[in-house]
A protein has these predicted regions:
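Short, conserved sequence motifs used for protein processing/export or organelle targeting and
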Residues: 1-123
Length: 123
């Protein structure tokens, strides 16, 4: 059982604007160790930017947690919207609520996809 919350994602983006986003993972899956969870974020357009170098990183095109960042279930990052208008941007998230036993057994895993549309121009 896992819930993925993204706070700060706009319904409609302004081209070139940066948005501060908080990713929260909620689960009744309790950890018996230091490791609490993890995540991977991908975006179809624009750029993902690291805010907290200790706990997040860009790895092979994904924004993800670091080893230190696996101690948490909440992370912050920025998304810079594309500089030109595109019909839609898809923000994809995979989240894990770890049970802390250093194996994938009994970890809660979930995904979330959010569609972000451009701000409508006033005519």
């Amino acid at each position: 059982n896992i819930e993925i919350n993204l706070i700060g994602v706009p319904k409609n983006y302004i081209p070139g604007k940066e948005y501060l986003i908080t990713l929260e993972i909620k689960s009744d899956n309790e950890s018996i160790g230091e490791n609490q969870g993890g995540f991977a974020v991908n975006v179809s357009d624009g750029r993902l930017l690291v805010v907290d170098k200790m706990n997040t990183q860009i790895l092979e095109g994904y924004l993800t947690h670091t080893k230190e960042g696996s101690r948490y279930r909440s992370w912050k990052f920025r998304w810079k919207a594309p500089s030109r208008v595109v019909d839609e941007v898809i923000l994809s998230v995979m989240g894990v609520a770890s049970n802390g036993d250093f194996s994938p057994n009994m970890d809660a895993v979930g995904t979330e996809r959010i569609k972000i549309l451009p701000v409508k121009s006033k005519k």
